[in-house]
Amino acid sequence: MEQHGTNEGALWGGRFSGGPSEAMFALSVSTHFDWVLAPYDVLASKAHAKVLHQADLLSDEDLATMLAGLDQLGKDVADGTFGPLPSDEDVHGAMERGLIDRVGPEVGGRLRAGRSRNDQVATLFRMWVRDAVRDIALGTTELVDALSAQAKAHAGAIMPGKTHFQAAQPVLLAHQLLAHAQPLLRDIDRIRDLDKRLAVSPYGSGALAGSSLKLNPEAIAEELGFDSAADNSIDATSSRDFASETAFVLAQLAVDMSRLAEEIIAWCTPEFGYITLSDSWSTGSSIMPQKKNPDVAELTRGKSGRLIGNLTGLLATLKAQPLAYNRDLQEDKEPIVDSVAQLNLLLPAMTGLVSTLTFNTERMRELAPAGFTLATDLAEWMVRQGVPFREAHEASGACVRIAESRGVDLIDLTDEELSGVDARLTPEVREVLTIDGAVASRATRGGTAGVRVAEQRARVDAASTAHAEWARAGVRR
C-alpha cells in the first residue's frame, strides 16, 4: 500500500511512526469542502489568542505578533493568495501552517494550546451557518416582495381557486400569490428561531472534557457574536442537531418554493393559459421551435428533492453515534453547504421569474365560474335566509346537477328551475351568483375580499421588511 509519507499538514502525528496510506489520506482530507470555514478560523483564532494572553500563556509581544500574523493570513485567504495544499488534511491544519509561515513556529505553534479541532470545527461551522442562513433569509424576502408586487399590480383580478386541483371557489389572484408568500415568511421565522440555537459557542470545550488552562469560553463567545458559551463540553463538541435543524429549515424553504414552482409550471401551459413567461427566464427546445419551457420552475421543483435528500442523509449519519465526537461528523458540512448553494441559485432565479410573469387576467376571470364554483355561495345565501345548511347544501347540489345536464352555469338557470329545486330559492339569489359578488362577500379575516387581501399584503410587506433588516444587520462580531 502506498504511504502518504509524513503527517505534514495534519495536526497530529507525534504518536505515529509514519504517515497515512494514500487511500487513508484521500478518505480523510476535507479541504475541498471545509475551506469555507477559513475566514471564521481567523476570527476564532484571534479570539483564542486573546484568552491565551489573559491566561498568561502568551506574552504581550507574542500576542501582538500572532494577531498581526492572523490579520495578514485573513487578507491572504480573502484575496486567494493563501489556500490549502494537497498535503493539508483540513482547513485547521492549513490555517496553522499559514500562520506559522507568517510568524514562525515559536509563536504560531502556541495557538493550538487549549483547543481541539472538535470544539474548533463545531464553532466555525456554527459561525458559517449563521451568516449563510441570513443570506438565504434576505433572498427569501426578495421573493416575497416579488409576489407582493405582483399582488399589488393585479389587486382586482379574479381567478379560479382550487382544492384537489379541481375548481372550488373564485378568489383574487392577489390572494393566491400572497398565499405563497406566507409560508416563505414562516421559513424566515424558522431561520430566525434556529439562530437562537446556533448562537451557542462550543469554543473552550476542547476534545470533549473542557480545558485545564483556565481559559475563558464566555469571552470567546462574546467576541465571536454568540449569545452564550455551551453548558456541556461533551454535548458541545458532539452535537449536530443544529446542522440537521438547518437542513430541515432549508429543505422546507425549498419545498415551499417547489409548490409555487408547480403552479407556475401548470399556469403557463396552453390548457391553463394564466401566464406568459419572460424570455429572460425561460428556455427553448433543441427540436421543437415553438417551445418556451419553465426551466427555472422545474429546476426549483427538482432541486427541492435534493435538499430533502441532504436532510435525510444527515439525519441517517447522526442517528447512532455514541458520545462524544466521532469522525462521522465530518459528513455534516457537505449537505449543508450544498443546500445553501442550491438556494443561493434558486432564490434569485425564482424572484426574477415571478417578477416578470405576465398574467392573462381575462383568461383567469373567464374560467373563475367554471366548474360551478359559485355553488357554495348559493348554499350560503340560503343559510342567510334561515335555511339549515344541510338542506341548503342539498339544494345547491341539485341546482348543479340541473345546470350540468343542460351545459349551463348556475346563473343561467331559470327562476322556475331554481324554485323547482327549493321554493326558498327566489330570484334574489342571483345577486350572489357572480364572481365579483362571491369574492367581495368573503370578508372575514384572511378571506379573499379585496379589503382583506389589501390588509394581508400590508402585513406581508411589513414582515418582509423586518426580516430583511434582521438579515442585513448580520451577526455582531
Curated annotation (Swiss-Prot):
Catalytic activity, as annotated: 2-(N(omega)-L-arginino)succinate = fumarate + L-arginine
Group of enzyme by EC: lyase
Main localization, broad class: cytoplasm
SUPFAM superfamilies per UniProt: L-aspartase-like (SSF48557)
Amino-acid biosynthesis found in the keyword field: yes
UniProt keywords, alphabetically: Amino-acid biosynthesis, Arginine biosynthesis, Cytoplasm, Lyase
Location in or out of the cell: Cytoplasm
E.C. number(s) listed in UniProt: 4.3.2.1
KW Transferase (keyword) present: no
Cellular component terms (Gene Ontology): cytosol
Recorded family membership: Belongs to the lyase 1 family. Argininosuccinate lyase subfamily.
Protein name per its UniProtKB record: Argininosuccinate lyase
Metabolic or biological pathway: Amino-acid biosynthesis; L-arginine biosynthesis; L-arginine from L-ornithine and carbamoyl phosphate: step 3/3
A Pfam family recorded for this sequence: Lyase_1
Superkingdom, natural source: Bacteria
One Gene Ontology molecular-function label: argininosuccinate lyase activity
GO biological process: arginine biosynthetic process via ornithine; L-arginine biosynthetic process
